[in-house]
Amino acid sequence: RVTRWSALLYYDLPDGNLLLTRVGTRRAASGVAEGENIEQAYYRADMSERFSDYVGISMSVSPIAGFSPDTAYDSVTLATARDPEAAKMRYRKRIVIVESTLMASQQAQRAIDWEMNRRYGRSKQLSVTIDSWRDKAGKLWEPNTLIPVNIPTLKLPNTELLIADVTFTRDSDGTHARLTLMPPEAFTVQPYAFYQQLAGFNQ
């Protein structure tokens, strides 16, 4: 809860310390590429948790309003967003109740954009096993780091993804690192506003 209120992510560093930070903008000295350092790769693109349209509404919606699916929420709609990729497949709407603090601070659109972008990011997950614990600069792979990815076979040519998780292994088969990678949008922090931050709250 504290990290959400502060708009922070948290994860372990290689030395065991806990780091509180924002979504990473730091780039590794090298990345992963087909035919170079990748031993195994698996890419999952899952549309089951994505929607064509997102509608943010206030709490004052009445169940009686459900008689008209197309217009029932018009009077309480605060923000909308459309996922163009999901919209090409089918119409699928998601209704989101916007928190009162976000309504009062005019952040409803931000909240709906976050809902859509996070679902987009989490729907695209790449898992790779590579032959080294470190990038070309000798630095250990770390979560929240952007790396270049080039895997044409999986339709991921020359893209950039964020490291979500790292597992280092050393056994009879050698030294390996397993990386879980996603688009940075998967880790954007959910908007939040304290009541005390709202104009006129303490007056």
Regions found by a protein language model. Name each.
Residues 4, 9-120, 127, 135-172, ...:
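Acidic, small/polar-enriched beta strand-loop surface segments
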Residues 17-19, 177-181:
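A generic structural motif
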Residues 125-127, 176-178:
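Intrinsic-disorder/low-complexity, polar/charged segments enriched in Ser/Thr/Lys/Arg/Asp/Glu/Gln
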